[in-house]
Amino acid sequence: VSWYAANEYCQAQGKKLPTVAQWEYVAQASETRKNGSSEKGYNQKILAWYGDSAKKPLTDIAQDKANFWGVHNMHGLIWEWTDDFNSNLVTGESRSDGSLNQGLFCGSGAAGAVDPSDYAAFMRYGFRSSLASKFALSSLGFRCAKAED
């Protein structure tokens, strides 16, 4: 599904694609805490998932345990579109790039990027690149977000 189709679908549901910050905030949660990174074993759990994922088939949607916010499958199932793409991690090199917006894209996924020493949090950042909003892939999806009531 393209970013445009995902965005239109969410709007038709009265929701929107989450921003990168919103996605990361929810992804940082463990099953019991808003910020799972302070929980013993959290980073190891994420690292183990990525280390073993190539050997295992993907799980069905919502078959894993929900995180603190009640959201399932925040890590590793597929790449996900986010609403915003103009972040400092994806803009062009401003000193020599005359067309900063030319290479921007919308795909995203991360555990969180609060602590640079938190290797698990940066693992999915490597996949936040080189995908224009008009493209669609079989491993690329989205989730819609709404304001908390």
At which residue positions do the language-model features occur?
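Short, structured beta-strand segments at or near domain termini in extracellular proteins/domains
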Residues: A136-D149
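Functional-site microenvironments in short loops/helix caps that host divalent-cation chemistry
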Residues: V1-G126, S133
